[in-house]
Amino acid sequence: MLRHSLRSASKLQSKNVRLLRAAPLLLKRSLSNDPKEVFTKLTDENDPQRDAFFKYGWGSWLKNDKQEKEKRVTRFSIEGLNKVLSDLHEQSAQADKTAKTDAVPPPSYNPNLTVSLPHNVTSKHLGTPKRGESVRVVSMASFHEGKHHRIYKIDTNAGKSFVLRIPYGIDEENTLAYRVKSEVATMDFADLKLGMNVPKVFCFGVNALNPIRQPFILEEYVPGRLLMKDWMPLASDSADGSHKEKLNSVIQPISEFQAKLAETEFTAFGSLYFAKDYRESNEPAYKSDTDGDLADRWRIGPSVERCFWRKKSALPFEQRKQYLGPWTISQPLDIVKSLGSLEAENARARLAIKQADASPEAEIDEQVLRDQITAFENLAKLAPVMYNLKTKSIPNMDAIVKPRLCHPDLDPMNVILHEENGKPYLLDFEGTTVKPFILHNNPQFVAYDGPKIYDLERDVENYSKLNAQEKDQYEFMYKRTRNQYLWESQLNQNAKHLISSIAPLVKLLRSPYVYAVQRKYDQEYLLIDEALVQLKEVWELFAKNELTNSEQFPVEFTEEWLRQHAEKLNAYHEKLIAEPFSATQGWMPQDLFDNLVKSGVLVKDANGDHSLKQ
């Protein structure tokens, strides 16, 4: 996710500004309250002063810390960045000389293996250096280290700032290339077709063969503050109802983004690409008689939804590709089947590598992989009968199975309020895909699948007689219920024809799929199994109401399997409680890690790994 750091670099003092004029480049890290400043020479590619600027420092892992951090080093060529910026300025100068038309020019595939968007590459957006000067970078700040990429703020002598996004090299080259191509095309679509406030993309590269020597996206820097600063999810209710206004001040703009994204009905399921980046199809991404040059600008290609790419290195890319789509508009549930089949095949490949003693995953349990195969095969079996696509029991069924954009990161941490006009900007589009709206889930910042409490006094027996700790637990459930209700109320207001997608029974039917999409860690396959078990218990009711077109649940569970499943699920939950960092695979923020080491809570072993002191 693209985040603007809450602790941005402090402004330079006057003496540093004078040094800046004398020095070719200033590097700043802003990951602490005391940002460090380092000067480097542009002509010295191997300057050791630069090393810390590229290293990962946002957090640490209890195990394999060195290896995990090495995967996230984002060393790139600063000299190459200057060349890319210079090339963009040359393109803008040429564009200023050519005749102006209303037509939006197609992306420019440049000889240096970058792609630029000419309609954004203008002197207005890029700035103009002083007469006689060539454009160059004068300072860079390490702005944020996210889950999937690093964010740098770039300042130039042309008076403009930019954001440079470098994805971590965790995934292999094909994965990164598809992700970057699709994200830029989706942001372009949101800007040109939907008129949304998003950062303008100037240039991107999909591999390390460009001058920057890394896959990258160079885009507009949007100054402002994060919407997250206004989000108070556990705020208590106020007598005058003002708490709803405060909560809705965050929920409403994000809901409006969702409604805008869902506005267009596409011609297939998958993800957006520029036409030249997906030549396997000649069909436009959507049908239009009025959009002219825009209608043929994009295509629907393979899905870049994270679940289709996460930890799939055990499978060769060509083997994976058959499961990635695009999928025909007449078969909306094939997405679910493909995901189940891909995950099962991936688990088989990992198991084979493990059994051959060739697996880099030392701690993975073979039985866990076998159980995963079964769980995902069961999900694939469920897919064809998951919904009755012709049912009259679900209002507007035709509308909610149409292909619509699904943004996986609708979150106040991904929205910035522009400092000049207060308008919300949606920053990051990584992993955005086109799928049936009935398969979209509520955003994580409001999602809640626990017990629903709408009124504490009415829904909780003897609430007033409970002790303080018990009241706190119920109040937490109430506030989570309240926040989700406010979100769903906004959906009803902004896209009423799609509201049936969040009906409780509709949610329950898609729950195994949602857990598969959101799965990050190996043992979370147990949540898919549990959702299937719960679904089987009420399947007869669904069949009677024609919500599904199969009277028989497609999966059978033996009593022995159910017993073992309950034991494994309980053990997993106990592990989460006993090992506080197991849910993050041993990762923790750097400040916390340093404090725990300093206080002796974390101890280091002979292998360099850390554990909690017993």
Curated annotation (Swiss-Prot):
Residues that span the membrane, as ranges: none
InterPro entries, alphabetized: Aminoglycoside_PTrfase (IPR002575), Kinase-like_dom_sf (IPR011009), Mito_inheritance_9 (IPR051035)
Bias (Polar residues): 110-125
Keywords: Mitochondrion, Transit peptide
Transit peptide per record: 1-38
SUPFAM superfamilies: Protein kinase-like (PK-like)
Top-level taxonomic group: Eukaryota
UniProt keyword annotation of Phosphoprotein present: no
Chain segments carrying region Disordered: 90-129
Subcellular location: Mitochondrion
GO cellular component terms listed in the entry, alphabetical order: mitochondrion
Family of this protein: Belongs to the AIM9 family.
The protein, known as: Altered inheritance of mitochondria protein 9, mitochondrial
Lineage, opening ranks: Eukaryota, Fungi, Dikarya, Ascomycota, Saccharomycotina
